[in-house]
Structures are given as structure tokens and as C-alpha cells.
């Protein structure tokens, strides 16, 4: 489904389409909220109030792509709450811990067939919609703002969503005037560091430092030495076309692949997976070969799914001390159904959908260059 599919020709949200395609939406009115922050009652009531606030900002008969993203972000910002809401005996009220991450996964599933650039802006806004509540009270507000300035959606979009979220809440903890002042101060801070509406300029060590810890020696090399070689990190679901991209663009580069290593050590079958012990051995061999390539300053490509930020961080931890140029290549099939069809005899539909659910789009702090390729 595309984001435009949830809007009528007159620029209004088509709630019949939403309810028929997003089952979680039908659970919002049955999901309670903490009374101190949400006197409006259930999540559905709050969501409708936030949508009304956003409609005041961007609504109209003719909606731009920007308008549709912002209205969709307002509509789905709390879509993860039904699965995350629990009663806390300690707090004596309901909590919805990590609902922003659950919401991101739901939105990506629903709009997977949307253009990646549009879809990932929406996913980013849902995942980060809580961030502005905590910036000023954090240990390093400037660092947080610099990081957010480089996100998939800019700080203006994020603060607009957060302000609508605040205005759409009946809160005993923050008045509308206090919300407005908080957002104004964050905007001023973003402007002062050059990150209001555009990404902050960063050194390589600062950028990668948002993803992983770096030694002083690694920071020195990242900022003052020419990389001289490249590590490509492939990212994509099974069947997305990673092998095809490699053959067409970097066929001469040394390829490191878990599938190939599994074959080497005798794990047999169609798209086989070994025991835990065997898979640990596959990881050891791959990492050993990756480090060897880095020591020799040899271009290489890590050709696995690498859909989680955790796995990509493990790779970065190994390679950054050697100062390579890091290129992430994200390859996507036109639709999720295409992924399933291309690998139907090798990877089950259930596995692909599970991997899609755990997919995390690469962030700016994970690469020097991001290449996005959608297979036809």
C-alpha cells in the first residue's frame, strides 16, 4: 500500500481504508493511557486530537507528499501502543514502553510497497516522535540535536509532529505553553549548531561515534588519513537482489558471504542453516577474513542480509580501526511479494516476513556513503 491510498481525493484520511489495512488501528480505542499525561482517555481519542492538530498545520484540499507524510505520522505515531501497553504496579498506571519501535515496524509493514525514501521518512518520524520530550533534560542536548539533524526526516518535521502530539494531549505534566516553549528552545539550539532544516556538518569520527565507541587512535585515523580501501556492506531481505547488484557493479571485489562459508564447512541443503555451534563457526570465519582484508587494505563486500543495526555495528566494530571507506548498499525488491517469490524455494515466506519485521534502515552514523538500489 502507498501512503496516498489512505487519503480521499479531497485530502481527508479515509478511515475505512485505514481500518481495513491496519488491524492495529482498530485496537486503539481499547488501549488505555496514563492519566497524568493523557487525560483524553484511550489512544484513539488522543490520536484523533493529534491528527486534528496536524491538519491545522498541513491540511487542505490538495495535499503535497510532505503533507501526507506528516498527517500519516500523526495518525500512526502511537500505533505501537496496543502491543506495548501494560499496567505497572510500580507506577500505579499504564505504560507503553518501546511503543515507538513497535510502531515503526507496523508502519514499515503496512507501507513496504511505498517508495523507500517516503516510507523511511514516515518510519523515522514514528520511531523518533518521543525524542524531543527528553532532549533538554538529557546529559548533552547539543549532541542529541546534532544527531537528530542528520535523521531521515529533518528536525522541523520532527518538532512539528512532537508539538501536535503535545497539543493533542490533556496533560497534567506539561501545559500547551510549556510544550511550545520546549520546542522553541530545541529549534533555537538546532539553529545554533547548523542543524535546523539541514544536517549538521560532522567529522567522520563524530558521525561514526553515534553508532559505536571509537578509540582515540581510530578517531585520529578516521579524521586525518585517507581511507585507501572500501568495505561494502550489503543490506537487504532474501530475494532483494544483492547478488545481482554485486555482479553488475563490483564483480572484482572480494566477497565474504555466510552462505559460501556454510558450503565450505559442509552444511548441506537448500539455503541451509547449521546448528548454533556451526553458525558461530561461520561467524568466526567471516569476521577473520574481514579483518584480514582490512589489514591488507583490500576492498571487500560483506554479502549477507545485515538487516539489523546490531549486526552492522558488529561489522563496524571490526573494520573502523583500519579506517576503510564504508559503503552500505541497500537493495530492495519492488514489493515484499517479489522478495517472497524470488526465494520461495529457499527461504520461507514466514522467515522473510519475520526479517522484514526486524529490519532497521541504515542510519547516517553507519556509513560514509549509502547506495539504495531497487531491483526491477
Predicted regions and their residues:
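N-terminal pre-Walker A segment at the start of P-loop NTPase domains
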Residues: 189-226
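Acidic/His-rich, divalent-metal-binding segments that scaffold phosphate/diphosphate chemistry
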Residues: 1-87
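Glycine-rich phosphate-binding P-loop
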Residues: 230-250
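Glycine-rich phosphate-binding loop used to anchor ATP phosphates in small-molecule kinases
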Residues: 277-324, 330
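ATP-dependent NMP and nucleoside kinases share a basic, alpha-helical "lid"
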Residues: 264-268, 306-347, 358
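Conserved substrate/cofactor phosphate-moiety recognition/catalytic segment
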Residues: 243-298, 335-338
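Divalent metal-dependent catalytic cores for phosphoryl transfer on phosphate-bearing substrates
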Residues: 60-177
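Conserved GTP-binding G-domain of TRAFAC-class P-loop NTPases and closely related GTPase folds
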Residues: 252, 332-376
